Amino acid sequence: MAHYHNDYQKNDEVEFVRTGYGKDMVKVLHIQRDGKYHSIKEVATSVQLTLNSRREYLHGDNSDIIPTDTIKNTVQVLAKFKGIKSIETFAMNICEHFLSSFNHVIRVQVYVEEVPWKRFEKNGVKHVHAFIHTPTGTHFCEVEQLRSGPPVIHSGIKDLKVLKTTQSGFEGFLKDQFTTLPEVKDRCFATQVYCKWRYHQGRDVDFEATWEAVRGIVLKKFAGPYDKGEYSPSVQKTLYDIQVLSLSQLPEIEDMEISLPNIHYFNIDMSKMGLINKEEVLLPLDNPYGRITGTVKRKLTSRL
């Protein structure tokens, strides 16, 4: 028999702002076998539930709590019975399950991150069951659904590291008594892309295709044409160009947030050794680093 404390006294000086609980980093590898041709999705999933009462906080009464171990088991079972066509669809399946199965669950938040496995391929021939880990951008999604509404779906790319050795500069910036940074017309530009976007609705969206399209736009606007590149006068301009092209080509996207750290590579001074280093040997610096962010959304008139 469950016991809980009944010595609660109302406190008029504090109130709840938000509550939630759940299970983080539930890892599964789902294998879809079509004869000898196998497809895989490996994911790490985190689930947060909000209940319609707070008796577990106020009284220590656990009678409404769905154990986090049950949440973990549910994620695994849904992977078995629903499969993982896309991580966004999988996250929506999790939201739908908890809202339809438990009347006292009023909000579900799901974060899913996909491990970047890529099928072995040689001369256009794809291997039937072998994959290689390719860290060229991690696909993640965040889905939140209230009992009274549709799911709100975000997808994103993170840990996409890119570098170019020229076609970037930084000039004309504000200078004061503390400025020591020289203007530069030509420099290395390196960053690790974090890009997250929101869908205006989740019906009839090919989430995998949209993710690949955004990733392609990021690479296109960063690198430019393969034979000559594209000049970047600032990290801010490159960030904005990615957003504008993404929203112009992908009508399913409502808004987009991007964060770009400016990862520095500095020329090593070899003059004390009697050598002139012409930007051939650079020193990578992990920190400190600049970080540039920006979020854009469609204007109301653009939706009409």
Curated annotation (Swiss-Prot):
Residues the record lists as Phosphoserine modifications: S39, S63, S232
GO cellular component terms attached to this protein's record: peroxisome
Annotated EC: 1.7.3.3
Modification N6-acetyllysine occurs at: K10, K23, K27, K36, K118, K122, K164, K175, K185, K221, K228, K278
Record PTM N-acetylalanine, positions in chain: A2
N6-succinyllysine: residues bearing it: K10, K23, K221, K228
One Gene Ontology biological process: urate catabolic process
Key word Membrane present: no
Cleaved signal peptide residues: none
Subcellular location: Peroxisome
Superkingdom assignment: Eukaryota
Span(s) of short sequence motif Microbody targeting signal: 302-304
NCBIfam families xref list: urate_oxi
The protein's assembly and partners: Homotetramer.
Name of the featured protein: Uricase
Source lineage: Eukaryota, Metazoa, Chordata, Craniata, Vertebrata
The encoding gene: UOX
